Amino acid sequence: MEDTKKKKKKNINNNQDSKKKERHIVTWSQEEDVILREQITLHGTENWAIIASKFKDKSTRQCRRRWYTYLNSDFKRGGWSPEEDMLLCEAQRVFGNRWTEIAKVVSGRTDNAVKNRFTTLCKKRAKHEAMTKDSNSNTKRMLFLDGISTPRKSENETPIAKKLKRSHILDLTEISNYGRAEACVNQQIRSPFSVLARNATGIDSLEEQNQTSNVNESDGEGMFLKKDDPKVTALMQQAELLSSLAQKVNADNTEQSMENAWKVLQDFLNKGKENDLFRYGIPDIDFKIEEFKDLIEDLRSGYEDNQLSWRQPDLHDSPASSEYSSGSTIMVDQSGDKTQPFSADTQTEHKQVGEELLVPKNPDENMPISGEEKFSSPIQVTPLFRSLADGIPSPQFSESERSFLLKTLGIESSSPCPSANPSKPPPCKRVLLHSL
């Protein structure tokens, strides 16, 4: 077996040596170059067989290469320009490896030069791609190694450094995801319950509130009506009148009481139209007597349905709500430091009773406050008529007495009663309103 292998190796080496010996280097003398130029001028560059027959040991291929490579002065020698490289690549894409046809397209270059240049370009391209692959793999490897080594470094860091690094990462995420991060923050931050919609009378009133208010909207706080705002006065008077008339009609349950209540309401509305104070009132107040009857029925049904729930004790009574059920001569201010007599706050008490009537529609909208203070949080409110006792008798009043009492209580006139004595206990306003 070993002998056969040795023999095969010897035969291969002998064949290679024979091929090397057969390889003949073609040399051209000056006489042969002169003969080649003369034959080309006679026969041109198309009849290489006739030209090669004039030589003893030259083939057609050797003659053609000698002419195009060394003797022809029209062909370029030296480096290739980028334009020639682009033209060569496009021609090779069209003609393939037909170098003679490609040489006709690339002017000034022989077929052999075109072939050699294309192989050189292919080698450069392959080398460049190999280098880019190696560089990409190296960068990926470095990133992978860095990703593995970073936790080891973070273990040795102090907690302060870790917090700084985490905050830095959060900043980067906020910069990259600016819109989404801001949207998420806006969704998470919840506005307090005290921020209420300002729905007074439209755009004009909103602009007036924005100009006269001292509250800065940039702080995220809501804007509310002041205690002495004319809108509050108008709404309170309307609410008190409607409630008192409905209770009176409900108590009498006669057509005469309905007509009297309707007359009082018409007089009040006519005065309200003439007075600028009531321009903030209810916009659709011009209703008919049938609608007034429906309103009374609604108030009657609502009062009967909610009477039991209003009598239930409230576990979270606020100091402001406890003032409604008290009959003392002194009203406690919310600040807890000052007391005032009742006669000085008659109009304030009217507004508080009206606010109590409006609470079931929007409990957070209008709450009694002191001075120029504005609402900052929702307050627990005692339900309507919770403090009324069933045993209080309902006195009977004539028409003149009833109108006098209405004027005294400030329903037709916003000024307090001048004859009120601050040293005496106040009249039972709730009983009077209930009876009216």
From Swiss-Prot:
Per its record, what triggers expression of this gene product? Strongly induced by auxin in a IAA14/SLR1 and ARF7 dependent manner, especially in xylem pole pericycle cells, lateral roots initiating cells.
Q: What happens when the gene is disrupted?
A: Abnormal stomatal clusters formation composed by two to four adjacent stomata and some unpaired guard cells originating of extra symmetric divisions in cells with an abnormally persistent guard mother cell (GMC) identity. Abnormal stomatal cluster formation is complemented by FAMA. Increased accumulation of CDKB1-1 in single flp-1 and double flp-1 myb88 mutants. Induction of ectopic precursor cell division and delayed stomatal differentiation. End wall thickenings in all first generation GMCs.
Outline the extent of the HTH myb-type domain: 20-71, 72-126
Q: In which tissues is it expressed?
A: Expressed in all shoot organs with higher levels in leaves, stems, flowers, siliques and floral buds. Also detected in roots tips.
- What's the protein here called? Transcription factor MYB124
Q: What GO molecular functions are on record for this protein?
A: DNA-binding transcription factor activity; sequence-specific DNA binding; transcription cis-regulatory region binding
GO biological process terms held by the UniProt record? auxin polar transport; auxin-activated signaling pathway; embryo sac development; guard cell differentiation; guard mother cell cytokinesis; guard mother cell differentiation; leaf pavement cell development; megasporogenesis
Q: Where's DNA bound on this chain?
A: 48-71, 99-122
Q: Which GO terms describe its cellular component?
A: nucleus
Q: What does this protein do?
A: Transcription factor that binds to DNA in promoters cis-regulatory element 5'-GGCGCGC-3' of cell cycle genes, including cyclins, cyclin-dependent kinases (CDKs), and components of the pre-replication complex. Binds to DNA in promoters cis-regulatory element 5'-AGCCG-3' of auxin regulated genes (e.g. PIN3 and PIN7). Together with FAMA and MYB88, ensures that stomata contain just two guard cells (GCs) by enforcing a single symmetric precursor cell division before stomatal maturity.
Under PROSITE patterns, the record lists: HTH_MYB
Main location group = nucleus
Keyword Signal part of the UniProt annotation: no
Q: What is the effect of changing residue 84 to K?
A: In flp-8; abnormal stomatal clusters formation. Impaired DNA-binding
Which terms are listed as keywords in the entry? Answer: Auxin signaling pathway, Cell cycle, Developmental protein, DNA-binding, Nucleus, Repeat, Repressor, Stress response, Transcription, Transcription regulation
**Is the Signal keyword given for this protein?**
no
Q: Which organism is it from?
A: Arabidopsis thaliana (Mouse-ear cress)
